[in-house]
Amino acid sequence: VLYAAGRTFIAGADIKEFGKPQGDPQLRDVIAAIENSPKPVVAALHGTPLGGGLEVALGCHYRVALPGTRAGTPEVKLGLIPGAGGTQRLPRAIGVEAALDMVTSGRFVPAEEALELGLLDAIATESDPLAAGVTFAKEILDAKLPPRPLSGWNDRLACDPGIFDETREKLRRKTRGQLSPLAGVDAVEAATKLDFAEGMKREREIFRDCMESPQRAALIHAFFGERAVAKVPGLSEETAPREVNSVAVIGAGTMGGGIALALAAAGLHVDLIEKSQDALDAGLSRIRKTLDSSVSRGSLTAAQAEERLGRTGPARGSDHLGGAAAGRAGNRREKSSTSS
């Protein structure tokens, strides 16, 4: 039984290591050793088995998961494809169409869907991954089931050859120049045209091309950048969040009105600031039309719309902004400001 302690099964590689020389043993070789075991190997999954973690699970002969488990191949979001056999084993497990979806979207698949697709053999009733794995392993032994390497499964590779070009066309329209989704299609297509060993070689070639791409470097830079902006230098983890009750939004145009609506929906009072009364009136009119449209669609009740409109107050000039700034300086719990 292969399982992980803590909050999750293997959740993928350390992104900080991407692009650096890899040491031995290579992950694909470790997975091959697991798959070639003469004894059945059960992967007991929980949390979020992602990327290389899911590839390890695919190298096992059977897979059982705790309720709430979500699995995926998010490499595409970082400009990559699964590089340790994921594009070759996944279509053998769940079929070509489902594999294309997972590899090119990077979405997380919940346990119930994974079971339906064939990615899982069972969803456990236990709350502990080791106990779940042992229970399932005993069932395998009682049934005298043999090892079941996915590398030898070819039945689910049958598909309409046109699916690959259709998927590429959809992705070109949707992803607008992103390379890794198309690379994922190429790798999954290789699984249907080459034997497993040759498919693995092709996957590796495609993975290396992605790894050397400036797009991959840019996407990983953006990944870390998005997380860095959430950290305030010099602010300790013990610092309590500041309570914000009122916000000033400068500009009542389309974007400013949208920001004001979002803040009002969050329960905040909004001072909407413009230079002229005409601009203020136009901005408030747009906000009311947006709320009326939400009521017409049924996404808001009339009472909710009026409540949000009531939290949005008009103001001319920068006096209110000055008040907001003074409020921050004098009472950090009362007022903030933003500009659109």
Where are these regions (language model features)?
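Short, well-ordered beta-strand core segments
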Residues: V41, R63-V64, I123, V247, ...
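Amphipathic alpha-helical segments at domain termini/boundaries
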Residues: R7, A11, E55-G59, M102-I206, ...
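NAD(P)+-binding Rossmann beta1-loop-alpha1 motif at the extreme N-terminus of oxidoreductases
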Residues: K231-T290, G313
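Glycine-rich beta-to-alpha active-site loop
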Residues: I34-L78, P82, G251-T254, I259-A260
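Hydrophobic, secondary-structure "cap" segments at the distal end of domains
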Residues: T87-E97
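Glycine- (often His-adjacent) and acidic-residue-rich active-site loop
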Residues: Y3-A33, P49, K77-L80
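Gly/Pro- and small hydrophobic-enriched strand-loop and loop-to-helix capping segments
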Residues: H61-G83, G118-A132, I273, Q277
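Rossmann-like NAD(P)-binding element
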Residues: D278-A279, S293-S340
